[in-house]
Amino acid sequence: MAQFNLYPGVPSDLLSTAFNISSGCLTALNATLSCDQDLFSMAGNADGFFWSDDNATALCTGACQSSAASWWNSCADACANDQLNAYGRIYPAQTVPGRFVDGLNIVCVTANTDLTLDVGINGTITNSTFLDNSTTASATSENLVSRQISSISQYCLVQSYDWVGSDIIRPDCTDPANSNSSQCVDPTDVPPENERLANLYPDDLLCSQCFLSMFYLRIASPFLPDVDHSDYLVDQWFDILDICNATSKVPDLLVRNLPYYQYAPGESDNWVDNTTYGFSDLQPLGGNGTTNVTCQARSINLADLNPPEIDYTTQTTCDVMAPFLNASTGDIWQMYQNPDCMPDFDYTEIPVVCLPFSCSVTQLNANTTCDQFVATLPAIGNNTITTTQFLSWNPNLIGICDNTTEQYVCTSAPGGTYISPPTNITTSSGDSRGGGDGSGTSTGSSGVGGSSRNSTLVAPGGTPPSPTQSGIPSTCDRYAQAQSGDGCDSFSQDFGITSQQLETWNPVLGSNGENCLTQFFAGYWYCVGLVGSATSTATTTTTSSTGVPTPSPVQSGIDPQCTKYSEAVSGDSCIAFASANNITPAQLYSWNPVLGSGGSNCGSDFWANEYYCVGAPDGSATTTTAPTSTAVATPSPIQSGIDPQCTKFAEAASGDSCPGFATKNGITATELYSWNPVLGAGGANCNSDFWANEYYCVGAPGS
């Protein structure tokens, strides 16, 4: 009978000493399996060998798969607290059998394997059915005649050796017709359609059970590398599911918190030292929380902490400190750089440490998957919490998502939990961006997927809607709610701001939007306007030169002689809006220059829930720009609040600063701030609201 041992012929006492692991873990790792020694060793690096049908058949016996499943489960229990030091890294000992079983799954999968019983996914594949004569239909394509699927082997891995494809589609650059193709000019400039997997394989191969099962096992593996190509594969997976309508053919993809194997500086007392857990060296924080290390969240003064008494017969320090500090166990480990949830350093040297913003904490039981746990959490408003959200709230989760340890975790976004919308805000539903191109086209089509949008105005300093994420500036006076299908770019376009503004006003998204894929959540509110920004005006009203109060929000450039305003609603077009207010489209465009000459900008700048001028003295009906009292035409784009007596404008260029711009235009910085209130008193808003390619007032009477 075939037998496999991980460490055959080596005395267990020597191994235990060499590996510095418990004897129980070593016994579990070195258990005898009913598998061929050579073939099972090959399974530990399945893609490093060329498998024949005979090899796979000899390995994939019921006895081998059953003993492999038992081995995996036994090591998960016996090695839960053991680490191995190899290749300069520390990693959980239980990952050793995990990699073997992961390879076994790849070698043994057939078109008839029940993936829900796969040991690497959820249990065991022992009961999977293998049909001796199972085949998969051959792929056909007039352009891909070489892509034939083997009908000899029942094993998908062996079949896959006959799946011939291409990494990308390359145009024939010798053909003069393709001489201007971007891909021929720059081979690295590959359009998305030329690297889409669905375009690289014919549908009958792409949608075959073997192709789907192999693809699923690879991206569901807990050992999927954390590289860009893995992200590409996951994106392609969901595309393939849509094309093949195959969601019922494979389990849902389990979202895991990627493991990070720390560098290995050494071990002591059964715990690797602090560096092993990825703890950076603590730097002293000032007692007031201003430090030589920036704390972006809570500064905790250790001398002021007064935690509850701990009953060590039934509790651990972590059991008490996590609810006391309203932080996850993993975050407290990170704060103290100690898995005992208590500091082991001198308070006088490091009096203050940094901890994330507070969150609601709940105890996560051991051996619960993230997906299972998240499914038990109540919704936030009408939005179900996702595993991706949960992982973003718990960046220091202890363990991986399909094998967690008992710990406290955040079940709300650090920095804020759900509250009912406040009563001092005005909420409107409907598209935030109007449609229409001047020809009567209805608004409402520019939201993502044509769905409705929610935007909310908040008085400066007022309570924002909820839920939001941390870091939004207090001067934000306009919020918008993201919904399913939104991306950072489309969301910013829908609300008339740039992607850079969205990322600046919502720091959680990253300075260059690098966190948009992981931190941009449906159901959450994001800042889309600051007080005085070009896309947002304060809820306090101003008065036009006719004495008529100016409502909010409005866009820039409205005729200062306006005598009447009206709010656009979802479904309006420029023409319909003009007709409903008993004016001509020409008057609407004249009094609201943002809509463009002849309504050329109606498709992009006519927004639901914004106010537009619908009444002005007859003398201004033919004016397409808002004249100042000195008859100087107002250029575009400008920001709100500019002195109506402005006699001169200048355009800011990339790299300009407020003081430099003022000097360049022969005025003082004080004058610049006075004539352009959006820049704030003393230029307080220059860093956020002084934009290149915008016009600012640089001349006024008496200057």
UniProtKB/Swiss-Prot annotation:
Residues 420-485, 538-559 are annotated as: Disordered. Coiled coil: none annotated. Keywords: Chitin-binding, Repeat, Virulence. GO terms for molecular function: chitin binding. The keyword Repeat applies. CDD domains: LysM (cd00118). Disulfide bonds: none annotated. Residues 538-549 have a biased composition (Low complexity). InterPro entries: LysM1-like, LysM_dom, LysM_dom_sf. Residues 478-528, 564-614, 648-698 form the LysM domain. Disruption phenotype: Leads to enhanced fungal virulence, with faster decaying on infected fruits. Residues 432-450 have a biased composition (Gly residues). It comes from the Eukaryota. Belongs to the secreted LysM effector family. In plants, chitin acts as a microbe-associated molecular pattern (MAMP) that is recognized by lysin motif (LysM)-containing plant cell surface-localized pattern recognition receptors (PRRs) that activate a plethora of downstream immune responses. The LysM (lysin motif) domains are small globular domains involved in binding chitin in eukaryotes. LysM5 contains 3 LysM domains. Non-secreted LysM effector that might be involved in manipulation of host defenses for successful infection. This is Non-secreted LysM effector LysM5. It comes from Penicillium expansum. The gene is LysM5.
